[in-house]
Amino acid sequence: MKQYLDLMKHILAEGVDKSDRTGTGTRSVFGYQMRFDLSKGFPLVSTKKCHMRSIIHELLWFLKGETNVAYLRENKVSIWDEWADENGDLGPVYGAQWRSWPTQSGDAIDQISQVIAQIKSQPDSRRLIVSAWNVGELDKMALAPCHAFFQFYVADGKLSCQLYQRSCDVFLGLPFNIASYALLTMMVAQQCDLALGDFVWTGGDTHLYSNHMEQTALQLSREPMPLPTMTILRRPESIFDYQFDDFELTNYAPHPHIKAPVAV
């Protein structure tokens, strides 16, 4: 994906060197946007191999409302292990906020069910929003939400989605985030009988870690391949009934995987 490589080049050319919570150090820019037309292919980075199985299982885990890594470990997905406690718990991270945002009255709001109902009944609403940034629970989370807020938009029978990501690890995290929200948009569009529009990614502190520079240079030396195709093989009764085998990725011919350390 040329947009992704252009972002890397922009950070290297225009970014500033900053310290960070992990102590690793970053080169960072503030405020960047990319747009992907989902009708023209699935936006999965091809200049290194991305682990689509982990992306799918993580998204299904979010949609289940789970915050313990047991499901992920059962499916050989380890991307959250560094932040889990000895019992596998992460606190009220994404799944909890998406599916059971606590209210002052002691109830819980299922934001995913709510936004899908709103898309169906009020497609022109400007409130088609899901937020994971619950200020009152941030101190209980193993990791504050990086992809914090997303909004749907319906026009001409097409569903688009914009994500605001307050903090973005461009080398390791961003390929996952783009693919995950593109897939979520496909699922919601199917549930709402809408065609695919755009996925718009907006980044806040958008950075390359200082120990990812060699890997970034290698990736920039590679030529992007044509976008693959993601097919949803069946239509479940609800957004919560999708299973891993419902998704088929074809024509994905990436360059080899590039290993890099995770900043914890």
Curated annotation (Swiss-Prot):
Outline the subunit composition. Answer: Homodimer.
This entry's Enzyme Commission designation comes to 2.1.1.45
The name under which this protein is listed is Thymidylate synthase
User: Which pathway does the UniProt entry assign to this protein?
Assistant: Pyrimidine metabolism; dTTP biosynthesis
Q: Which InterPro entries match?
A: Thymidate_synth/dCMP_Mease, Thymidate_synth/dCMP_Mease_dom, Thymidate_synth/dCMP_Mease_sf, Thymidylate_synthase, Thymidylate_synthase_AS
GO CC terms, sorted: cytosol
Protein role? Catalyzes the reductive methylation of 2'-deoxyuridine-5'-monophosphate (dUMP) to 2'-deoxythymidine-5'-monophosphate (dTMP) while utilizing 5,10-methylenetetrahydrofolate (mTHF) as the methyl donor and reductant in the reaction, yielding dihydrofolate (DHF) as a by-product. This enzymatic reaction provides an intracellular de novo source of dTMP, an essential precursor for DNA biosynthesis.
Q: Which reaction does it catalyse?
A: dUMP + (6R)-5,10-methylene-5,6,7,8-tetrahydrofolate = 7,8-dihydrofolate + dTMP
Family as reported in the entry's similarity comment: Belongs to the thymidylate synthase family. Bacterial-type ThyA subfamily.
Q: Does the keyword Transferase apply?
A: yes
Q: Which GO terms describe its molecular function?
A: thymidylate synthase activity
Any matching Pfam family: Thymidylat_synt
Q: Which PROSITE patterns match?
A: THYMIDYLATE_SYNTHASE
| Superkingdom to which the source organism belongs | Bacteria
* Annotated positions binding (6R)-5,10-methylene-5,6,7,8-tetrahydrofolate: 51, 169, 263
Residues recorded as binding dUMP, renumbered to this chain, are 21, 126-127, 166-169, 177, 207-209
Which cellular compartments is it found in? Answer: Cytoplasm
Q: Which Gene3D superfamilies match?
A: Thymidylate synthase/dCMP hydroxymethylase domain
Respond yes or no to whether keyword Methyltransferase is given for this record: yes
A biological-process GO annotation: methylation
Catalytic center residues: 146 (nucleophile)
Q: Tell me the keywords, alphabetical order.
A: Cytoplasm, Methyltransferase, Nucleotide biosynthesis, Transferase
Its lineage opens with: Bacteria, Pseudomonadati, Pseudomonadota, Gammaproteobacteria, Alteromonadales
- What is this enzyme's class at the first EC digit? transferase
